[in-house]
Curated annotation (Swiss-Prot):
Lineage: Bacteria, Bacillati, Actinomycetota, Actinomycetes, Mycobacteriales
SUPFAM superfamilies named among the record's database cross-references: Periplasmic binding protein-like II, Winged helix' DNA-binding domain
Organism of derivation: Corynebacterium glutamicum (strain ATCC 13032 / DSM 20300 / JCM 1318 / BCRC 11384 / CCUG 27702 / LMG 3730 / NBRC 12168 / NCIMB 10025 / NRRL B-2784 / 534)
Keywords annotated in UniProt: Activator, DNA-binding, Transcription, Transcription regulation
Function, in words: Positively regulates the expression of the exporter LysE. Induction requires the presence of a coinducer, which is either intracellular L-lysine, L-arginine or L-citrulline. L-histidine also acts as a coinducer of lysE expression, but this amino acid is not exported by LysE. The lysEG system prevents bacteriostasis due to elevated L-lysine or L-arginine concentrations that arise during growth in the presence of peptides or in mutants possessing a deregulated biosynthesis pathway.
GO molecular function term, any single one: DNA-binding transcription factor activity
DNA-binding residues: 18-37
Annotated HTH lysR-type domain residues: 1-57
InterPro entries assigned to the protein according to its UniProt record, in alphabetical order: ArgP, LTTR, LysR_subst-bd, Tscrpt_reg_HTH_LysR, WH-like_DNA-bd_sf, WH_DNA-bd_sf
Null mutant phenotype: Deletion of lysEG decreases the extracellular accumulation of L-lysine, L-arginine and L-citrulline.
Entry similarity comment: Belongs to the LysR transcriptional regulatory family.
Gene: lysG
Name this polypeptide is given: Lysine export transcriptional regulatory protein LysG
Length: 290
């Protein structure tokens, strides 16, 4: 297959549109369209859904994976020839809580490589693998232990969340000495964040009806919303600890939520991907529970 056409397909998916790809590649939108049509004609399949944003079809996902691997290996070959690790694109999927707590030391490691670049795709830990399956990323922080086809898995450790709220919010929902979990307003990071719902299943008898749910799609803002009484939420213990110590929030109970975390990456002979894996594992050893 034509590597230029594969690179164009990858640009469409990464930029989300034919127009975005044309800007990234410094070619006209019609040239982008012609390259994709030629590739589709070659494989005999439609590869891109012309939606907003543009998405790869099932056949397109196979080629996107191939294209991303090609780009990585080409960059590594170029770096080896020039004697340095440079201009190597590393794209991974990660959840917000990991990004805001234990993951930052990875930035130091990648920065020391010289010209390597790191692109993070933010997604709930229950859904990061979908990006890996589609070929959108090289690796993913996930709660799923079963490997995606063509990938290998490394256990990272356990992320602990604590159920917290302001004392006044807790007191407002105490009924006959018991906390009314179902009635108390709750916070979510986004529509895919079901951690609070899974946690609530163990605390409420029977199905939970309509609840007051606020969406706060920011790791820092989420903690701040809890601190200011917008609702209760599950916060990583490292973020909750300062607020608990200051008395700004309280534990709603003594039951922590422990989520095993894993790193899944393509099974690919790549020096930079191996180094990235080592960096992720080292950061997890320092920042997660065993």
């Amino acid at each position: 297959m034509n590597p230029i056409q594969l690179d164009t397909l990858l640009s469409i998916i990464d930029e989300g549109s034919f127009e975005g790809a044309s800007l990234a590649l410094s070619i006209s939108p019609s040239a982008v369209s012609q390259r994709v049509k030629a590739l589709e004609h070659h494989v005999g399949r439609v590869l891109v859904s012309r939606t907003q944003p543009a998405k790869a079809t099932e056949a397109g996902e196979v080629l996107v994976q191939a294209a991303r691997k090609m780009v990585l290996l080409q960059a590594e070959t170029k770096a080896q020839l020039s004697g340095r690790l440079a201009e190597i694109p590393l794209t991974i999927a990660i959840n917000a809580d990991s990004l805001s707590t234990w993951f930052p030391p990875v930035f130091n490691e990648v920065a020391s490589w010289g010209g390597a670049t790191l692109t993070l795709r933010l997604e709930d830990e229950a859904h990061t693998l979908s990006l890996l399956r589609r070929g959108d990323v090289l690796g993913a922080v996930t709660r799923e232990a079963n490997p995606v086809a063509g990938c290998e898995v490394v256990e990272l450790g356990t992320m602990r969340h604590l159920a917290i709220a302001t004392p006044s919010l807790r007191d407002a929902y105490m009924v006959d000495g018991k906390l009314d979990w179902a009635a108390m307003p709750v916070l979510r990071f986004g529509p895919k964040d079901v951690l609070q719902d899974r946690d609530l299943d163990g605390r409420v008898d029977g199905p939970v009806g309509r609840r007051r749910v606020s969406i706060v799609p920011s790791a820092e803002g989420f903690g701040e919303a809890i601190r200011r009484g917008l609702g209760w939420g599950l916060l990583p213990e490292t973020q909750a600890a300062p607020m608990l110590k200051a008395g700004e929030v309280i534990l709603l109970d003594e039951i922590p939520i422990d989520t095993p975390m894993y790193w899944q990456r393509w099974r690919l002979e790549s020096r930079s991907l191996a180094r990235l894996t080592d960096a992720v594992v080292d950061a997890a050893i320092e920042g997660l529970r065993p």
